[in-house]
């Protein structure tokens, strides 16, 4: 069943001939779906709508404002009713459905007597693995050999919300707080993947002891150390990152 679900999702992403995104047909209210059909904006697939929008807006292609707007709407629906819904469901399947919780936030979450690690970006698998690893008795014992009382994990930006809503891990802040977090002088390690990562954090980190680790092959930074995250060796790589 898991394989069938995964292949259906992949087909919704990359379908090139006919059809439409399953989520649009199955989840949208009937009246909403009828309205989409009327205007011809039901997404065919996620990738296809994005590529077509880029083609139409290239120099000398589509010059009709209303026509461009309709494709913009179809692309937006592909993003929301395709990409966002699929990624949300996959994350819930893999890591569990979030529940309302109480948690802390802001820079007060950092602890002077523990190793402060911050996960930052948008890929929940990396954050989940680091969460698992920092709670391993062996890793906690390792931190104590370095003079710390333990490991304190925090989040930044969207990844922060993933581990907050599922595990109660506090968030250090949002997009505009990443450099300020380093300026506290308390962040020992900042591990990042993709999106919303300011390039200046490596320059700021040089003024402190903070290590910045990039993990995605698509997103490297000058001044950061790169440890590529591989889902097939997730725990092993997460341990390596935490031990930095």
Regions found by a protein language model. Name each.
Residues 1-244:
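Metallocofactor- and cofactor-centric catalytic cores in central/energy metabolism, strongly enriched
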């Amino acid at each position: 069943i898991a394989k069938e679900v995964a292949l259906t999702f992949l087909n919704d992403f990359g379908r090139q001939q006919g059809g439409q995104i399953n989520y649009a047909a199955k989840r949208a209210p009937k009246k909403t779906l009828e309205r989409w059909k009327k205007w011809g904006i039901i997404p065919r697939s996620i990738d296809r709508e994005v590529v077509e929008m880029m083609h139409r807006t290239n120099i000398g292609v589509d010059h009709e404002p209303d026509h461009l707007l309709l494709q913009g709407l179809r692309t937006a629906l592909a993003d929301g009713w395709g990409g966002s819904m699929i990624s949300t469901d996959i994350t819930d399947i893999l890591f569990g459905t979030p529940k309302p919780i109480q948690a802390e936030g802001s820079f007060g979450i950092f602890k002077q007597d523990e190793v402060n690690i911050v996960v930052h970006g948008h890929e929940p698998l990396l954050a989940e693995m680091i969460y698992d690893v920092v709670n391993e008795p062996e890793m906690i014992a390792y931190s104590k050999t370095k003079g710390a009382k333990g490991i304190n994990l925090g989040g930044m930006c969207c990844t922060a919300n993933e581990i907050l809503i599922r595990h109660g891990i506090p968030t250090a802040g949002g997009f505009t707080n990443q450099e300020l977090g380093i300026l506290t002088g308390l962040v020992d390690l900042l591990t990042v993947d993709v999106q919303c990562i300011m390039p200046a954090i490596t320059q700021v980190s040089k003024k402190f002891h903070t290590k910045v680790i990039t993990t995605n092959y698509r997103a490297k930074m000058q001044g950061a150390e790169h440890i590529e995250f591989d889902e097939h060796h997730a725990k092993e790589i997460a341990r390596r990152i935490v031990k930095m």
